[in-house]
Amino acid sequence: FEPNEITTEQILAGILTVLAYDKKNDNLDYYRSIITKVKPDIKKELCEAAILKTKNEDFDLAEEIFLALNGLDPEDVAIKLNLALFLDQRADSYRNSGLNEDADAYDADAFSYYEDVMNAEPPLPDAFFNAGFFFMKQHKYREAKDAFETFLALTCDASDDELGENGVYKKERAQEIISNISNQNIDDESFKAAYDLISSGQEEKGLEEIKNFLVNNSKVWNAWFLLGWGLR
């Protein structure tokens, strides 16, 4: 081993590894100053690399890059949101492969970052829009409705020109989901309790809850699906 054989790229890679995994290192600020001085566009480069790796389903490397980004600039809310979205997507990948325990662990990590970005000041509308879909996936319809309503409240004063085509689509999609939740009454406590009980193996209690819900909500297909799931 010859120290003079170490390249700048290897040193920077080592620093990024520290930033990703050693959050309590006393020298983090020093390491950040080094890497941003040598590579002023490092955040942009890493973001592009992480997104590309995610698209190619190279999840291990993508996760390492996202964690390094978060370590490089812990106060950047956009980075935290991207990390939440990545963890959310990786949880889906694990669940689709039948690895439910791994999926649950990644969902828990994703929720932690979603919660963090939803508490950011000034508020970031996209944090609530994306968190809404995360809650929908978990059948937490009341939380989803709250998130989408907050997104609409944060964007209500923006014109269509300011929002752009994608922003207008998001507003319309958020309103559509809110209406569906309200019309089907699936943010009702009985529906949520039934889902939680059945998914935790307490089918008898869950079936009682969903039958009570169906008395006044007989046209809600989600409820009939939940009933069938409990009877399986």
What are the language-model segments listed below?
Residues 2-5, 29-47, 173-196:
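TPR-adjacent "capping" and linker segments in tetratricopeptide-repeat scaffold/adaptor proteins
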Residues 40, 74, 121-122, 156, ...:
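Short coil turns that delineate tetratricopeptide repeat
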Residues 43, 77-78, 125-126, 159, ...:
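Helix-start (N-cap) detector for alpha-helical repeat units in TPR-like alpha-solenoids
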